Design a protein with these regions (language model features):
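A short alpha-helical cap/connector motif
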Residues: 1-91, 98-143
Length: 143
């Protein structure tokens, strides 16, 4: 248990998942690098909540990001309609996945769906990749 905050992706065998965890999720030097390259622009959310800072880092690395609340996928027809319109380069960030039992079911249904490939459960949000060139994997991350 003492080692959990220091693992930072070790134990993840997929190179894609490991790279995502190390370079996006657990990146601590991102603010310094961003400030050096964008000295005159102060759009990095320094005082924003942790989830917003994570979303900023994801959007910087992956251009096609969709952020949805789990409540927007509660209806089965909305859920299926969304999955029919995804592309391989899309990254989905689902917020509030553990807020309610129904939202948890939506997340588990999304993880089990054949359209999703890589899923990361970060406790307060979930991240889904749809790239069909990768193998289907699910990761629970202590973030």
């Amino acid at each position: 248990m003492l080692r959990m905050p220091r693992t930072r992706g070790f134990g993840v065998q997929s190179p894609t998942a490991y790279s995502f965890l190390r370079k996006v999720v657990n990146e601590k030097g991102f603010l310094r690098i961003y400030c050096q390259t964008h000295a005159g622009i102060s759009s990095y959310p320094q005082d924003a909540p942790r989830q917003k800072r994570l979303l900023f880092r994801i959007r910087t690395v992956y251009p096609n990001v969709v952020e949805l609340s789990a409540s927007s996928l509660l209806k089965r027809e909305d859920f299926q309609q969304f999955l029919w319109n995804v592309s391989d380069d899309m990254v989905l960030v689902v917020t509030d996945i553990n807020l309610d039992a129904e939202y948890k079911k939506v997340w588990l249904r999304l993880v089990a769906d054949n359209c999703t490939v890589l899923t990361f459960d970060l406790v307060d949000c979930g991240i889904v990749f749809f790239d069909k060139t990768k193998f289907k994997q699910n990761f629970n991350v202590n973030y």
